[in-house]
A protein has these predicted regions:
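Hydrophobic faces of well-ordered beta-strands that scaffold small-molecule active sites
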Residues: 17-21, 47-49, 82-85, 223, ...
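Mature extracytoplasmic enzyme cores
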Residues: 1-11, 16, 31-42, 60-288, ...
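Active-site beta-loop-alpha junctions enriched in small/polar residues
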Residues: 23-26, 52-54, 87-90, 227-232, ...
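Glycine- and acidic
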Residues: 16-22, 50-57, 184-196, 283-295, ...
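Hydrophobic targeting/anchoring helices
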Residues: 14, 91-95, 102, 301, ...
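Active-site mouth loops of central-metabolism enzymes
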Residues: 18-30, 385-388
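Conserved, well-ordered alpha-helix/loop/beta-strand core segments that scaffold catalytic motifs
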Residues: 207-217, 293-321
Length: 403
């Protein structure tokens, strides 16, 4: 107890703050070394290398990695820690565009629509907008299936999957599309987080390069690597049963195959049940199985794959998922946060804007207890502006520690 109190009063570098250290210009060794001295003088325990918009030194290139090595050597000399960050900005997984240069690894989603893409107008094609990670209809997808839909009093009274060339009324279409390219992803696209092969490619261009450069310090000077806001195409819904609009849901090339193998039935045969309620209070088992299977596909492909690599290389996987606070927000962007935490050696959360997301903190804490982890990372203090004073900083840390 005496040692615990002493550590609490005068924490070692392992238990001091380690801010996101923005690398956002043409990197200079002299400038970086000077900044590490400032961080040490401020009493911080280390720093998290965080690439931001404006970085003018090629990401993960020889010069960049050479500077990382020098920073790690300096931190070791100063008794500080370096925490790696796995991406050029966020969300993690696209490897600064190096992963998604290959179409095989680009994000994918299912577009469910009343509009046939061969005949739809440009206005209809532009109807959905948003970030590339969230998904956007482009009208160039591969046809998966067509359905004849019958609605009664706002419920899905009947539906059937049409055979090739078969006619019908009130036809809806299902297409598989690739995530569009975007300047945010260095003129590439976001990654297919449902594909383990894409995550392995992400490891090749990121984690393996860090291993080659500073791997001897994994588990020592470098305790962990931070993954930030991985997600899939955000799920969309119809505003009302009779609405005629495009709806996007996460999907990938072999989803039908793995769904059939897991549940013994076709997902595409029953796809309309994901979007409309069944009559007479019936519950759609297909809808439940879709959300469950999607959650497992994502967790296995991303966090489990990264965590396994990290564990075998003596470095902890930490970071946080996207949209953590509520069951609704989680369902839309990642299915469920707690299933992903099993892959993290140090589960983490995001607490921006001085918010009080008690559910976010408690679910990560709960997962850590259940898995026998003894730490939880919190990304805090961010997006609080320059007038956020020391009292605010202390309060934000204190209430999380008190939980």
């Amino acid at each position: 107890m005496e040692n615990y109190l002493k550590e609490f009063e005068h924490p070692s570098s392992r238990f001091r703050g380690a801010p996101f250290w923005a690398w956002n210009n043409k990197l200079s060794e002299d400038q970086l070394m000077r900044q590490t001295d400032y961080l040490k003088q401020m009493g911080l325990g280390g720093y998290t290398i965080h690439c931001r918009t404006g970085l003018d030194t090629p990401y993960m290139g020889p010069e960049f990695l050479g500077l990382v090595k020098k920073i790690v050597e300096k931190a070791k000399k100063d008794g500080m820690h370096v925490y790696l960050y796995d991406e050029d900005r966020w969300p993690s997984g696209f490897g600064g565009g190096m992963v998604t240069r290959e179409d095989a690894y680009r994000g994918r989603y299912l577009v469910f629509t009343p509009f046939c893409q061969e005949t739809r107008t440009s206005t209809e094609k532009d109807r959905i907008t948003g970030s590339s990670a969230a998904g956007k209809v482009q009208g160039n997808g591969r046809l998966l299936a067509r359905y004849e839909i019958s609605l009664k009093d706002g419920y899905l009274s009947e539906y059937r999957r049409l055979a090739d060339g078969e006619e019908g009324t009130n036809i809806w279409y299902a297409y598989l599309e690739l995530s569009p390219k975007s300047p945010w992803f260095n003129n590439e696209s976001y990654v297919n987080t449902l594909d383990k092969k894409a995550t392995k490619r992400f490891i090749e261009v990121t984690h393996e390069k860090y291993l080659q450069t500073v791997g001897e310090e994994f588990g020592g000077v470098i305790p962990s690597i931070f993954t930030d806001e991985p997600q899939f195409t955000h799920k969309q819904t119809l505003g009302k049963a009779e609405e005629k609009k495009d709806v996007l849901i996460p999907y990938t090339d072999d989803f039908e195959d793995t769904f059939c193998k897991t549940y013994g039935e076709s997902f595409l045969d029953h796809l309309p049940e994901v979007f409309w309620e069944l009559p007479d209070g019936q519950i759609s088992l297909t809808r439940y199985h879709y959300h469950d299977h999607l959650a497992e596909r994502f967790a296995e492909a991303y966090a489990d794959t990264l965590g396994s690599w990290c564990e075998s290389h003596r470095i902890a996987l930490t970071g946080h998922m996207m949209a953590e606070p509520t069951l609704g927000s989680q369902t839309g962007a990642l299915s469920e946060a707690m299933r992903h935490y099993r892959g993290f050696q140090v589960p983490g959360i995001d607490m921006l804007c001085d918010l009080r997301e008690y559910t976010t903190a408690k679910q990560a804490q709960s997962a850590a207890h259940q898995m026998g982890r003894n730490e939880v990372t919190s990304e805090l203090y961010g997006v609080t502006n320059w007038d956020f004073d020391f009292i605010g900083h202390k309060l934000q840390g204190d209430w999380q520690a008190a939980l």
